[in-house]
Amino acid sequence: MASGFLWSSGFCGDDKGDEVAGLDLNLSTVAFYHFSNPYTLSNDPCPWSVFEEARSCKKRKKTPLADESIGSNGSLYGGGGSNRSTNSLSSLPTLQFRDHIWAYTQRYIAIEAMEEATLAMMGGDVNESKEERNGDGMKLVQQLIACAEAVACRDKTHASSLLLELRANALVFGTSFQRVASCFVQGLSDRLTLVQPLGAVGVVGIASKTVADTSEKDEALSLVYEICPQIQFGHFVANASILEAFEGESLVHVVDLGMTLGLPHGHQWRSLMHSLANRKGKPPSRLRITVVGNFPERLEEIEEELKQYAESLELNFKFEVVYKSLETLQAKDFNVEDGEAVVINSILQLHCVVKESRGALNSVLQRLHALSPKVFILVEQDSSHNGPFFLGRFMEALHYYSAIFDSLDAMLPKYDTRRAKIEQFFFAEEIKNIVSCEGPARVERHEKIDQWRRRMSRAGFQPMPIKMIMQAKQWLNKVQVCEGYTVMEEKGSLVLGWKSKPIIATSCWKCS
């Protein structure tokens, strides 16, 4: 099993079995890595190199060869222990991200060993083809990491050579990890073509993401909504929170940031209208939805659809559009009336406003705070794809999207074209943006829920605990997606995960 990749001293550190014991062996290997806790290995007696070659390749205009950076006892994972103690304080952030990669690889090897042991306990033989597959998977992980390092160091020769091998091994209809790797290969290839020579600053970004600008993206987005539970989960929790906020209110006003992500129908608002029309007591005297968006034709279609549905429910309904970007919004754009109960709904939108400077998002949040909403519903991807270092972002994204591709394995057959469309026209676009873009072009700046808590607090919001964990679990059982999805409560937020790996986090906020 890829023995050439093992360190001479065996597994380093003392994991005490707590991180590995609860892992589900059906999940792909990369999805098992516990990225948030690599520093448990800090007292490791094993030699460390912490990627000295890769760390200094920018200065030396050199990148380590594949066998040097990946092989056993090579400069990537072994040797050079003395360098660790003599590093300056300024190099500590680099060490942390390289430590992440080391920890990821160790987790991969540990899980492979567990898989073989489990097969043996079940009476199965680890045949040659299984060993070959494990070896191929290990090689693919090694190549991806080495290629990411080469791209980060702007070594086009080495990176191009690795990309040729990766394209042959990362198959669109292959295993879960082969498929996710194919998306990262596309991103690395795009980044490589745009990197500037050594000495230049940054990476030139490709065009900004547009909302459903092709028929393929339209179809992929609709398939994601129908098949994957992420968006529907966000809608369910958001609508439940909105209904609670509107209880007893007569004039109700929803401010929707992004309007259903560009979906062709107003799925979320049809459900809310039905619930409001049939709530206890009497329905509101008027429901007003103000949408922020820049795709007028689609919004006109959704407006007509929702108006017809409101008429069928005998619900007084008003639909308005603010044709602006989130960054240019002003409180006056929403024309809030006296006596209106306002809620703000943000489904997978605000991460696009996060920039290198903290001020951009904070300004938007403060202007939204001026609307004095009864509740602000925030639904975002629960992963750290906005770190300052490319390699750290790369590994976080690999971890996150490996879990998503694993879930697609459980939901759809191997050669189902719907799965290929979802992966290649939706999730691959997110991956490529995270991997290949910098500056304003990088809009998929997903962050963990803890970071969103800090951002919301700075803007003057305070958390409102979501007390509906049982309803969320019942909803998950009702939609019957497949086994493996989980709902967890975390500090008042609800998190949808795949085999306990967080995928989507929902939280509610009110004005302080």
Predicted features by range, described:
Residues 1-512:
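Long, compositionally biased intrinsically disordered terminal regions
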